[in-house]
Amino acid sequence: AIYFKGDWLNQFEKESTKDKEFFSTTDNVVEVDMMAMFGESFNYGEADGVQILEMPYVGNDLSMLVILPKQGQMDKLEEDMTIENLMKWNSKLKKEKVNLFLPKFKFEIKTMLTKTLQEMGMPTAFSGNADFSGMDGIKSLQIDQVIHQAFVAVDEKGTEAAAATAVVMIESMAPLEPEEPKLFNADHPFIFMIQ
């Protein structure tokens, strides 16, 4: 099991969280607690019709990367999610002042992996022919089920996640130029990852 709890380097003010519309589809709107932050510096970039924002955690070893497609373009983003594109999008990041709107969210997922693992070449482990004698001294054990659970909660203070994978990145600094802050308004579906 993996557990992660990280506080944002730049935390949201609770007073700035307001009820706002979130367009889960172009036809479906729900009210969410939308966090807001104005004029803060983040690694930010735009490429291939998506906005990319890196939100560092205290210590700067880990961050949340938020990838926001244009509204109604989530299917295209899912198709475009390749390691090559992620590397390209990461290379476009530079320090920018950003007006950020991000919903508070929490989700939990439970997935049964038994069938998947059997199809990947592990059928014997789930049968009476399994040999786990190294665990019990006799051949009396077999796998019944494999369940994967993941939990993520994002709020003003930071992120709490279980079963998350982390990749340590080095933050590069770019000089700041005084200009209008970029708008990153996550009021529709987006993809995030902890890296």
Describe the role of every protein-language-model region.
Residues 1-195:
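Secretory/exported precursors with cleavable N-terminal leaders
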